[in-house]
Amino acid sequence: MAGRTMQAARCPTDELSLSNCAVVNEKDYQSGQHVMVRTSPNHKYIFTLRTHPSVVPGCIAFSLPQRKWAGLSIGQDIEVALYSFDKAKQCIGTMTIEIDFLQKKNIDSNPYDTDKMAAEFIQQFNHQAFSVGQQLVFSFNDKLFGLLVKDIEAMDPSILKGEPASGKRQKIEVGLVVGNSQVAFEKAENSSLNLIGKAKTKENRQSIINPDWNFEKMGIGGLDKEFSDIFRRAFASRVFPPEIVEQMGCKHVKGILLYGPPGCGKTLLARQIGKMLNAREPKVVNGPEILNKYVGESEANIRKLFADAEEEQRRLGANSGLHIIIFDEIDAICKQRGSMAGSTGVHDTVVNQLLSKIDGVEQLNNILVIGMTNRPDLIDEALLRPGRLEVKMEIGLPDEKGRLQILHIHTARMRGHQLLSADVDIKELAVETKNFSGAELEGLVRAAQSTAMNRHIKASTKVEVDMEKAESLQVTRGDFLASLENDIKPAFGTNQEDYASYIMNGIIKWGDPVTRVLDDGELLVQQTKNSDRTPLVSVLLEGPPHSGKTALAAKIAEESNFPFIKICSPDKMIGFSETAKCQAMKKIFDDAYKSQLSCVVVDDIERLLDYVPIGPRFSNLVLQALLVLLKKAPPQGRKLLIIGTTSRKDVLQEMEMLNAFSTTIHVPNIATGEQLLEALELLGNFKDKERTTIAQQVKGKKVWIGIKKLLMLIEMSLQMDPEYRVRKFLALMREEGASPLDFD
């Protein structure tokens, strides 16, 4: 049939507007026919027709979406001709349709089942024409949706013939919906529509990982394992499409707690996680900033942090972007409830507010809270359960491989500009910097740089840089070693000054007993290093006063070369209350647990316990704390050697403390004249003739004196005139009861 000119009109009823049909008078065309509307030589549009008596003959009525799609205006003259579909080539097999709410005021977050939508669509629009780019209105569950046809594939001709599918798919521009056509819905960009079911396309999701991200250039040394564990626990589920996560019934991890010693990279790791994720800028909050002097403001500050995430989840549902909130020093606001003094209870209500926001009645699935602290023991346990800060990751001191990575990172720019001398061996520095944190390694590099710069500053009346030499500036191995020796000491390392004072006179090996103690100590050191079955080794050096127990303990600790050595001594706890003593001892042991290999010397145990024989009196609180610490095994992968000293083995036996030690080693006094003469010869304070005189008096006799007391007597006698020294020494020995002899 030849075409005719008709006039475009407005659709007469709302019901017909939802039919996706052009409306004519029955005098012009019949219902169910298809027409091609030509608005210009190159613009043709296919419509299915319906009839209605209110439409004037010679007019063809269109809904607003149809007029918008075809570019029609009311009263426009258009050319209309009948159109016939080739059923073998133009039946729709699969049609992809973009969907969104028609009116923004009707937006909700309810899930819409695409399977039911597809069935309703086929029922409403069966045997209708559809074109790529066509716009229409679709009513479902009393809601109006705007649809846009994105893609049409023709049905396989084999299926139409009743044969098995051949697998051939052909794209077409115009097609006819039939009973077994498939419809796939695709959510419009930035739409908050929540689609569920199988009749939806896989969304083109923006990758959660920044496409420009390079894991090798992240600038975090020594945290490879920790970072991969965090990625596995917290981000693996977020990389998958929402539909797969939904089918698995999987919930995303909402919180990570990073804890560990200061300067080990907690804040750096959190910052890099924020950069890695293709999300909005993380909100970084220092814990104390949350607190406010006005009533209710602290809780309001918590609510403000989560407001954006709540609003977006209400709008976009499962397709909401990720919101990252980083709490630095989270222990400042999340202490155990009920632990804070005062009547206001502000801290408790802040904790309650945070708990309810992370995982409360209205659950948010689009947040990631990263908390950082070096005091995880202070944090309320309700915050650490699964569903809140469930991924707990210790960021500990870096091992040798980690230190090598960190030093490479901090010296990379110097190497790139040839400012690092060829004699600098980064591997050597990594070995020498045991128990250095990442911040301390960075400080070491800065100190070496300042040492190198200082060489090129002229020491004159004015501070000037020698520019001639400055151009040849290089940081050398000597600069690093000088900084290591003088400037930077690890907080969790070995401070030689701690134990140097205990062995300032060296170790006097006056006989086999001393050698045996040192040999046994060396065996225990090797056991601690090499045995996987005994990560905790403890030994008690017991013996009479002044026998050199502390010096021997310090020597064993020094010879161990452990990266962490600490001496727990009563002279550092003078005036401490019982509670303060317990806390000081606990801190020493807690610090030891952070190192791979540690040695703690618990000196003069009876003094730590405040023991006095009159009464007798001792501190039971300190005793119980010490018993627990002596028996507590270090964390997995860490090893600890404890060396205790006491002059009152009998007292510790009564207190049942001896059983807390793995073994006990006796440190005797000098007991024979021969041992005394050996000690005098090693000390070298007396001349040969003087030693001969002393030998005549003590050889073959029993003596009883500690090496420490012997040193004191020798030094006193050396203050006399040379001819009286021996007589004075022997007299002092007699007065001290060190020998039964009556010296002349």
From Swiss-Prot:
It catalyses: ATP + H2O = ADP + phosphate + H(+). Phosphorylation at Ser-569 interferes with homohexamerization. The modification Phosphotyrosine is found at residue 259. Mg(2+) binds at residue 550. It comes from the Eukaryota. InterPro entries: AAA+_ATPase, AAA_lid_3, Asp_de-COase-like_dom_sf, ATPase_AAA_core, ATPase_AAA_CS, Cdc48_dom2, CDC48_domain_2-like_sf, CDC4_N-term_subdom. It is found in: Cytoplasm. GO terms for molecular function: ATP binding; ATP hydrolysis activity; ATP-dependent protein binding; ATP-dependent protein disaggregase activity; D1 dopamine receptor binding; ionotropic glutamate receptor binding; metal ion binding; PDZ domain binding. CDD domains: RecA-like_NSF-SEC18_r1-like. Its EC number is 3.6.4.6. Its main location: cytoplasm. Belongs to the AAA ATPase family. PANTHER family: VESICLE-FUSING ATPASE (PTHR23078:SF3), VESICULAR-FUSION PROTEIN NSF (PTHR23078). This is Vesicle-fusing ATPase. The lineage of its organism: Eukaryota, Metazoa, Chordata, Craniata, Vertebrata. The gene is Nsf.
